[in-house]
Amino acid sequence: MSKPEVFQVELLHGDQARSIQVSPDEHIWDAAFKAGIVLPAMCHQGYCLTCAGRLDNDGEVDQADSEQYYPHDREAGFVLLCTGRPRSNLRIRTHQAKAMREFRKSKNLPAPYSWNAG
């Protein structure tokens, strides 16, 4: 069975949900921006965690373009939208930078800008 040309990605924030189509070679943040959805981001390199989201399903995201992404991040369902490429249909809770920074601190992993994590 061949891979689909695009994946459905549902972006969740509060009580709002927006669905976009994202090709496997496109970063999720870029596809959202093209669709008129402005998500948090700063470095666009997968380092600062500003773009962090969290999977709300068992989807798969390729984070090979990320400067810092750890197995613990994947296990906890965190994704970096600015460098993540979909490998399946996804449901992602956006605006998760604070939660990801707190998680990283709890695992003694680098958490840039973690003074904002509480």
What annotation goes with each model-predicted range?
Residues L12, C43, C82:
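Functionally engaged cysteine thiol sites
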Residues P40-M42, D73:
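Short, flexible, mixed-charge glycine/proline-rich loop motifs
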Residues M42-L49:
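Cysteine-centered iron-sulfur cluster-binding motifs in ferredoxin-type domains/subunits
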Residues K34-A35, T50-M100:
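Iron-sulfur (Fe-S) cluster-binding segments and ferredoxin-like electron-carrier domains
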Residues M1-L39:
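N-terminal pre-ligand scaffold of iron-sulfur
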Residues L12, Q21-H27, C51-D56, D62-E67, ...:
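N-terminal start-of-chain detector that recognizes signal peptides
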Residues M1-P4, R87, R93-G118:
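Iron-sulfur (Fe-S) cluster-binding modules
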